[in-house]
């Protein structure tokens, strides 16, 4: 049995962080957490690029452009959708999630999602590191691991065909 896993060593990786400006009180903390986690795992500041878009609904379009640029080993979507009194929350959260998932399937680079979907601002801030843990950092570490396992998977030889 052969087992392939991604390491958490990010030395030499180039990472694109795509951040929604809407709910910036939360998304800026996700960005801080993601960038800090990448540095702690070995990514140099010069190998981290930050792209900002208006909101979480717009994230997938920019994320796809960044992922397709072939400049990055990994891209991370960072956003926050907070429930309000209308169905808008479900539409934005659902479509953003579908968009990120589609990009992950179509892309040659690792794609990770750090989009919070919370009932309250307080919940979002907690998940952005105010109390404990930072989902932006977790998404960045997942991107590192996925980038490394994708590299390993690319090295797996094709099966030989019987002639």
UniProtKB/Swiss-Prot annotation:
Listed pathway(s): Cofactor biosynthesis; riboflavin biosynthesis; riboflavin from 2-hydroxy-3-oxobutyl phosphate and 5-amino-6-(D-ribitylamino)uracil: step 1/2
Q: Which GO terms describe its biological process?
A: riboflavin biosynthetic process
Q: Source organism's superkingdom?
A: Bacteria
Q: Gene3D superfamilies under this entry?
A: Lumazine/riboflavin synthase
Active site located where?
88 (proton donor)
Summary of the function given for this chain in its UniProt record: Catalyzes the formation of 6,7-dimethyl-8-ribityllumazine by condensation of 5-amino-6-(D-ribitylamino)uracil with 3,4-dihydroxy-2-butanone 4-phosphate. This is the penultimate step in the biosynthesis of riboflavin.
Which GO-annotated molecular functions does the record name?
6,7-dimethyl-8-ribityllumazine synthase activity
Q: Which GO terms describe its cellular component?
A: cytosol; riboflavin synthase complex
List the catalytic activities from the record.
Answer: (2S)-2-hydroxy-3-oxobutyl phosphate + 5-amino-6-(D-ribitylamino)uracil = 6,7-dimethyl-8-(1-D-ribityl)lumazine + phosphate + 2 H2O + H(+)
Q: Which residues bind (2S)-2-hydroxy-3-oxobutyl phosphate?
A: 85-86, 127
Check the record and name the Pfam families matching this protein: DMRL_synthase (PF00885)
Keywords for this protein: Riboflavin biosynthesis, Transferase
Query: What's its EC?
Result: 2.5.1.78
Protein name in UniProt = 6,7-dimethyl-8-ribityllumazine synthase
Detail which positions bind 5-amino-6-(D-ribitylamino)uracil.
22, 56-58, 80-82, 113
Which family, according to the similarity comment?
Answer: Belongs to the DMRL synthase family.
């Amino acid at each position: 049995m052969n087992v392939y896993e991604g390491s958490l060593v990010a030395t030499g990786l180039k990472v694109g962080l795509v951040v929604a400006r809407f709910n910036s009180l939360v998304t800026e903390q996700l960005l801080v957490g993601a960038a800090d986690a990448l540095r702690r795992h070995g990514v140099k500041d010069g190998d981290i690029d930050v792209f900002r878009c208006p909101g979480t609904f717009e994230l997938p379009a920019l994320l796809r452009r960044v992922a397709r640029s072939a400049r990055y080993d990994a891209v991370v979507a960072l956003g926050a959708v907070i429930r309000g009194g209308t169905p808008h929350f479900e539409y934005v959260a659902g479509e953003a999630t579908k968009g990120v998932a589609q990009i992950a399937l179509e892309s040659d680079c690792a794609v990770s999602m750090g989009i919070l979907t919370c009932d309250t601002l307080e919940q979002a801030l907690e998940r952005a590191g105010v109390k404990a843990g930072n989902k932006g950092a977790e998404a960045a570490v997942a991107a590192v691991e996925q980038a490394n396992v994708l590299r390993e998977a690319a090295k797996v030889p094709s099966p030989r065909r019987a002639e």
